[in-house]
């Protein structure tokens, strides 16, 4: 399809001079075009430059080294004589100055790049020189001293009260409930966990148990036994005090009997004949 359009253009425009506008046909432009290399465009190939005869004589050795392009003899090739910028309506001098400015900028940028590369190289060298130095140690990275101990956590009255109520309800907390309690009391999960562990140990010491009850019913049974034991101990101490009081009362009774015996022994004996005489007279 591309060959069709190229052939149609080739048949309509026989030479490249007809494609150039008339206002470019001046002596200066012709001289410039004659001094400039000729550019040949072909399908599937890049731009091929054909230099002027004086330039070819000056660079005679380059003509022998450049291979000939087989696409130049193709009938589909479009040959444009002169500067390719003239074909598109651009001035060759402006393009030349533009390229010159770009070359100067590139030279300046290359110096900057070289300086930047040297600076980077210097920084890399400094980094390699500083790398053998020991890394910075933060306080949390250093091991704790032997004489130092972690501070004891203090709980407020409100926190202690809430933790005690939670312990009475359930001595063992699940992970979800522990998170809820820690958020409610402004504590960490670790602090709540440690508090419950210490509270269970305290309960075992108070109840003389080697193992904390796993269920609430077992805990209630243990509490009941403890209360009964306390009641027995209190009743035993009260009975011993009452027995001592009863013993004192017995001593008092025996003392009273001896007093009565002594009083009875001190009175004279009663005469039976006198009693009978008085009864007959009545």
Curated annotation (Swiss-Prot):
Pfam families found in the cross-reference section: Homeodomain (PF00046)
Q: What is its main location?
A: nucleus
Start-end of Gly residues biased regions:
236-258
Q: GO CC terms for this protein? A: nucleus
Q: In its keyword annotation, does this UniProt entry include Oxidoreductase?
A: no
What does the record give as the function of this protein?
Answer: Sequence-specific transcription factor which is part of a developmental regulatory system that provides cells with specific positional identities on the anterior-posterior axis.
Write the protein's name.
Homeobox protein Hox-B8a
- Species whose genome carries this gene: Takifugu rubripes (Japanese pufferfish)
